[in-house]
Amino acid sequence: MRNIYHTLLLTGVVLVSPLIVSADSDQTAGDWFKNSYGPLWADTPYQDIEAILTHYHSEIVTHGSDGSLSTTPSREWLTAPMDSWREEGWIRAELTDMTATSINAATTGVMTVWTDYYAGDVTETSCGWYLVDAINNEWKITHYADTPCS
């Protein structure tokens, strides 16, 4: 009887396991962030807005330092700050450090350090936290918070 139970359990696992798939099973959320999302900011982010937007869910939840949460359509969330940064002379950003922490098979937190490049050879460091979720079998950024660079 015990062997039958174990055989049935093993058979069930073998049959069901292909149905349990996280986003893009070929790469982790951290690899996706580092190799797909990060490079889009390195050269011509203004020309790559549509490609950058494919990495976001339709809305982004921003976690404010005052404890507030706000939900914004991703296009507005991305383009409004980019326009403001451009007016300040911002040119591009380079992902210089990153730590990804898997929360579960479908959710990963990503802490980042970026080097921002401005006109006149000025650089600045900025840091942020992103929540990346598997949505419809694709990794998407769903949440963001500025973080102190330490």
Q: Where are the regions that the model predicts?
A:
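A mature extracytoplasmic/lumenal domain signature
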Residues: Y56, D66, N104, T112-D116, ...
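Short, low-complexity N-terminal intrinsically disordered segments enriched in polar/charged residues
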Residues: G12, S17-T54
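Short beta-strand edge/turn micro-motifs at domain boundaries
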Residues: T125-S150
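Bacterial N-terminal signal peptides that target proteins for export
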Residues: M1-L8
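Short, well-ordered alpha-helical segments enriched in acidic and aromatic residues
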Residues: Y46-H63, T72
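Second-shell loop/turn segments in exported
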Residues: P39-A42, H63-S68
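Surface-exposed, charged secondary-structure patches
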Residues: V61, E76-G120
